[in-house]
Every structure is written in C-alpha cells, then in structure tokens.
Amino acid sequence: MAPVIPAASAPHKPRKFYQHLYVQVLAAIAIGILLGHFYPDLGTQMKPLGDAFIKLVKMVIAPVIFLTVVTGIAGMRDLAKVGRVAGKAMIYFLTFSTLALIIGLIIANVVQPGAGMHIAPASLDPKAVASYAAKAHDASIIGFLMNIIPDTPISALGSGDILQVLFFSVLFGIALAGVGDRGEPVMNVLVSASQAMFRLVHILMKAAPIGAFGAMAFTIGRYGIGSVANLAFLILTFYITSFLFVVVVLGLVARYNGFSIFALLRYIKEELLLVLGTSSSEAALPSLIEKMERAGCRKSVVGLVIPTGYSFNLDGTNIYMTLAALFIAQATDIHLSLGDQILLLLVAMLSSKGAAGITGAGFITLAATLSVVPTVPLAGMALILGIDRFMSECRAITNFIGNAVATIVVARWEGELDKDKLAAALSGRISVEDDDLPIEATSPAQ
C-alpha cells in the first residue's frame, strides 16, 4: 500500500479569527480566570468540565500511540533504524534533561529565591505532604523498569500506561514487519484505523475550549490568585528560567538544526494553550503526534520519540526539581555544600525519569528526590504545596516544547525529516485545521 497522496481540492475560505482553535481556547482561559476570581464557589464547580475533557483525550492516547508506532515501524525497510532512533533519542533526552537540572541548580544559587525566610523545619507540618511522600516511597528504579512490561497487551491499552503501550507497540511493529507481504492485510487495517483515530482526535479537540475553561475556573476558584503573593518570587524565578531555557537553549538547538523555535511555537500554539488551560501535557499528546507527522517527521520517529519523551524528556520538571529543592533549603536556613548539591543532582536525574505528563507528577518526583537526600527536609515541601498548581502549567508547557524540539532534531539526525514539509508547516503554508489533509501512511511494501 503506497503512501496517501493529497487529493486536489478547492482552496479553503480564510477562517475568521474567532474560528481558530487557539483563539477559542485563549478566550475560554480568560473567562475561566474571571469566573474563578469573582465567583470562586461557582468556579470550583466547573472542575468536571476540565476532568471530562482530559479523560476524553486520554481515551485515545493509547490507540494513537499503538497505531502510530506499529504502522511506522512496520513500514520501515531497515529495522536497525528502530534501535538507532531509540538510541539517539535517549542520548538527546539524557543530555538536555541533565542540562535542565544543572540550570535549575545554578539559578537557585544565583537568585536565591528562598533566602531570608528563616523558617524553622520543626514548625512545618509533614502531614500536608504525607500522601506525596507515600507515592514517592512506593516508586523505585527496578519497579519502574518492571512496570514497563505489561501483564497483557489488553491491560496496557486498557490502563493507558504510555510506556507499556509503547513497549508492546514496538515489539508488535517489529513482528509485523518480519512477516513481510503476509502482514500487508493487517497493515492496511491498521493504516485505516490510524486515519480514523486522528479524525476522532480532530473531533475531540473541538471541545478543548470547554475543558480549558473548566480547568482554569477550578484552579483560580480553588486556590485563588492571592495565594501566589507570598511566594511570587519563586514562581517568577521559575517562569523566567523556563522561558530562557526554551528561548536560549532550545532556541540554539533549533537554529543549529535548521528551524526557528519561534516558528515552532506558532505552529503548536493551539496545543500550548490547551496545556496551559488544563495543566497537563497529556491533553495535547495526540495532537502533537499528528502535527509532527505533518511537519515532515517520519511516523516511526514520531511514534518512538514523543511517547518516550513524556517520561524521559521533562525539561520543565527538571528545572523545577532542583530549583524547588534549593528554595526549601534556603527557606529553612540549611546550607548545601557542593557535594550535597551534586548528590541532589544525581538523585534527581534518576527520580525524574518516571514522571508522566500528568498534573502533579513533578511534585511527586520532587518528594522522591528529597526522600533520598536527607539534608533537605521533606516536610519543607509544605512551603510550596499551595503554589505548585500554578507552577505545573509552566512545567507542562516546557516539557511539551522540549518534546516537540526533540522529535524534529532526532528525525533530522536519522535523515527522516522532510525539510520542505517542515518549512511549509512552520511558515503556515500547511493548515492542520483543514479536515481534508491526510495522515501519512506507511506499509511494509514501501
């Protein structure tokens, strides 16, 4: 089965500004903020709208990953490329995740957002973070690795565990490619199912403004804008650091690899606003997979890099972990030597690898890190518990951008990037809102 070729069609009528998804999501976020601020009780009641939308998106994440990975791998002529793509992706993830941790450490030492607070560790209530500490205690490297192997393929798809789905999908894709032409009927079915699944993603994205409105109204109504005032300096430091990481570090990576970080941000602006509104990068995962394919990244690369990156390439979470850990130490007047900070960095490198793209995962990984580093009191997390929700948006957005950049970079390294399609997508010549644009299809006979 050959790749799907776009059929000639009449040019689309230009959309009015309010018909664009990013405008609708932005307006929904603004309305949610106003409702949560002026009518907090009513705002908190909007939570089911955000939860329902995230559940709708999570419903399609597992099948989207399965179909993308299987059809991508089975359509490759050289299966050795699968190993090369995975290896290059892990090198990229390890390099930039470590760099993000180091940047968070440096900024915390230079800016010192917790200095002068003089909070006695004995005065902190450990019960406030007990549930997070318990979740962190249950996590271990061996347990994390063993959990990647699903009990059954159905349980992986049913639970929606990204790494379990990815693990089975890679094995099944390799097996399907191994049977050659006999697997083509199965491949044809999967390609058609993939196209139908992405059409479903388009349908679900129409509800994004409702989900963003509900999630933002709840956040402001529940926590209040005023709750950030006392720790505004920490929040500001984290936001500025993440912004500079995206613009400077990822910007240089993008420029070196032949594209503009700002053009990429324009290309994924709808997804970024969705992540901002829902505080979950998972909410935009299916849409990111589709957009990276349309931007010229080969399906097999997209299917491997993005799902893996959601656990191993968390730049925003890594910046947050070292910055927050040093903030707690500074606020409680605990001096961390260079050796203590290096230990903190090494532990954070390991504990951050199991975080999923869900709200609150960064807080749990921070608890896992502090539970291993005895110098910083775990109870100190109570200091940032109230504002963590306001920092999770920035974590999720930075993680999301990092995975978009990683996908393009790894595709280029592997020679699986269509530079003309990338240029067309980033310049706006390809509209991903057009319903008649086909999804790339691959087959064993390609």
Curated annotation (Swiss-Prot):
InterPro entries per UniProt: C4_dicarb_transport, Na-dicarboxylate_symporter, Na-dicarboxylate_symporter_CS, Na:dicarbo_symporter_sf
Pfam families named in the record: SDF (PF00375)
Cell location: Cell inner membrane
PROSITE patterns: NA_DICARBOXYL_SYMP_1, NA_DICARBOXYL_SYMP_2
Family from the record: Belongs to the dicarboxylate/amino acid:cation symporter (DAACS) (TC 2.A.23) family.
Transmembrane segments: 20-40, 56-76, 91-111, 160-180, 200-220, 233-253, 319-339, 344-364, 367-387
Gene Ontology cellular component terms for the protein in this record: plasma membrane
HAMAP family, sorted: C4_dicarb_transport
Function noted in UniProt: Responsible for the transport of dicarboxylates such as succinate, fumarate, and malate from the periplasm across the membrane.
Keyword tags: Cell inner membrane, Cell membrane, Membrane, Symport, Transmembrane, Transmembrane helix, Transport
UniProt KW ATP-binding keyword: no
Biological processes, Gene Ontology terms: L-aspartate transmembrane transport
PANTHER family noted in UniProt: AEROBIC C4-DICARBOXYLATE TRANSPORT PROTEIN (PTHR42865:SF1), PROTON/GLUTAMATE-ASPARTATE SYMPORTER (PTHR42865)
Any one GO molecular function term: malate:proton symporter activity
Stated name of the protein: C4-dicarboxylate transport protein
SUPFAM superfamilies: Proton glutamate symport protein
Entry membrane topology: Multi-pass membrane protein
